[in-house]
Amino acid sequence: MFCLEDQVVLIAGGSQGLGKQFGQKYWDESRHSKIILVSRSDVKLRNAITDITGGRQEPVELVMPEVAASEPSASGSSAINLSKSSNHAGFESELRSNSNRSSSSLKESTNVVTHLTTNAADSRIVYIACDLSDPDAVERMFVTLQHNNLLPTQVLACAGGSIPKLFTDLTAKELEMGVKMNYMTTLFVIHKAAQMVPQAHLILFSSSTAFFPFIGYSQYAPAKVSLKALTSILRHELPNTRISCVYPGNFYSEGYVLEEMSKPDITKSIEGSSYPISCEECCDKIVWWLNRGYDDVTTDSIGWFLMSLDMGLNKHNNNSAYWFVQWLIGVIANLLVVPFYMVLCSYQINKWHKQNKNKNTLL
């Protein structure tokens, strides 16, 4: 149901964390798959490929073509317009049309990409440095993939990150970063993939906080809830496309270490027994469930239980492990367990507020 072999896999957020771990898994467990790592940082991507391959392969970059300044996109910056291209033929037609209108600039940039085709063809793993929160950059990325015959068969939208703080302690920049990292990066990649390669397997990465958003995650959880909603909508609109959504719990990564530095004590208290698993174990669990045909995937028992409490209207197309048991648990727990837990949770939060109010009074 989910095969690592003979794929062209695009891993958004592939320079570190879970995305990098997926790159490692494809490298170790396949022989003929093409692996494309994408993130903003050229240096991190090069280091990731060196780590994944053990230094046995030089990092190969697919350089995105520039476009003529005379052809501005609707957003005001230069880009090749792919919005009307819903299949390969449409994409190629649009590309030819744009090439004719802006021949000098696009020809020069196309030569750059064509120059790299041989290296890309010989490499099992390549990278593209791209700001995935910029829709124009995502369009140019797909131009690059098309030129190199690397349109993906699987898309893993792993990009994201959390800055756990109280809402009023967050800066406007951090809030903006949360929306860009955790929603827009996935939105634009999945949107373009759905237009260009509707037969590709689309895998979105949300979070177990999407089932239970709580204090300390205002920069992160709302975007992850949005991805859960987006998944439900896409399953309505794209019935012939396999669309999976992963809801990981805590796992060790570079991002997790940084999160613990800013995470409020009350957030840690409510998280309680949600102990982080290794990044490798998290990756293995996701692949294990996807391989068995499940498309709503959690990585720990707490995430699975929280999902069972969320079997709402859009869950008619839910495809998670033991979904009927989840439904039964959800009915019982929502009636008998959740009310008591929410009283306890409210008590913890109110107690924390009073303690902090007293501290501020003393100061």
Curated annotation (Swiss-Prot):
Broad enzyme group: oxidoreductase
Pfam families linked: adh_short
Enzyme Commission number, as recorded: 1.1.1.102
Subcellular location field: Endoplasmic reticulum membrane
GO CC annotations on file: endoplasmic reticulum membrane; lipid droplet
Keywords for this protein: Endoplasmic reticulum, Lipid metabolism, Membrane, NADP, Nucleotide-binding, Oxidoreductase, Sphingolipid metabolism, Transmembrane, Transmembrane helix
UniProt-annotated binding residues for NADP(+): 10, 18, 131, 220, 224, 253
InterPro entries reported for this sequence: KDSR-like, NAD(P)-bd_dom_sf, SDR_fam
Function: Catalyzes the reduction of 3'-oxosphinganine (3-ketodihydrosphingosine/KDS) to sphinganine (dihydrosphingosine/DHS), the second step of de novo sphingolipid biosynthesis.
Annotated protein name in UniProt: 3-ketodihydrosphingosine reductase TSC10
Organism lineage string: Eukaryota, Fungi, Dikarya, Ascomycota, Saccharomycotina
